[in-house]
Swiss-Prot record:
Belongs to the sorting nexin family. GO terms for biological process: endocytic recycling; late endosome to Golgi transport; protein transport. Residues 11-21 have a biased composition (Polar residues). InterPro entries: PX_dom, PX_dom_sf, Sorting_Nexin. This is Sorting nexin-3. It is a peripheral membrane protein. The gene is SNX3. One of its GO terms (molecular function) is phosphatidylinositol-3-phosphate binding. The PX domain binds phosphatidylinositol 3-phosphate which is necessary for peripheral membrane localization. It holds the Pfam family PX. It comes from the Eukaryota. The lineage of its organism: Eukaryota, Fungi, Dikarya, Ascomycota, Saccharomycotina. It is found in: Cytoplasm; Golgi apparatus membrane; Prevacuolar compartment membrane.
Length: 157
């Protein structure tokens, strides 16, 4: 006499019947991932000495990066210096533009202008950090994203 029919999933499945698995348990961590966020703008100073800085949050498992997760703050002028460094560091990659400068006669510290700039800076970093040549070959990128003591004057080309 023949055996009763059993679905293949019952035959293969060795885990308990009702145990649900998370996405990471099923698929594991992606081989190389890099997540970048620019958030939490803070305006500092007073009078004509106002400036805004932005928090950069980086999560990655790429071996070239020193830390799996980092949080640092950067000013717009830091992004400008970083972009110039990238342009000098590599001629094989077109570096995207930064969001435009806000002119002094406009209210550059209102919430709308700060949010537009934050979005533009995040887009810039996502594009730059997503480029395979920069992701693994640019020490400047890693330093800018992860080193709290980053100083553009100390960069040697």
């Amino acid at each position: 006499m023949s055996k009763p029919f059993q679905p293949i999933s019952d035959v293969i499945n060795t885990s308990p019947k009702n145990k649900s698995q998370s996405f990471n348990e099923i698929y594991g961590e992606p081989e190389n991932f890099l997540e970048i966020e620019v958030k939490n703008p803070l305006t500092h100073g007073y009078g004509s000495n106002l400036f805004t800085d932005y928090e950069i949050v980086c999560r990655t498992n790429i071996p070239a990066f020193k830390k799996r997760e980092s949080r640092i703050r950067r000013r717009y002028s830091d992004f400008v210096a970083f972009r110039k460094i990238l342009e000098q560091e590599t001629t094989r990659v077109i570096i995207p533009p930064l969001p435009g400068k806000i002119f002094l006669n406009s209210n550059k510290f209102n919430d709308l202008n700060i949010e537009k700039r934050r979005q533009g800076l995040e887009k810039f970093l996502i594009v730059v950090s997503g480029h395979p040549l920069l992701q693994t070959g640019s020490k400047s990128l890693i330093e800018f994203i992860q080193n709290e003591k980053w100083d553009p004057k100390q960069i040697i080309y």
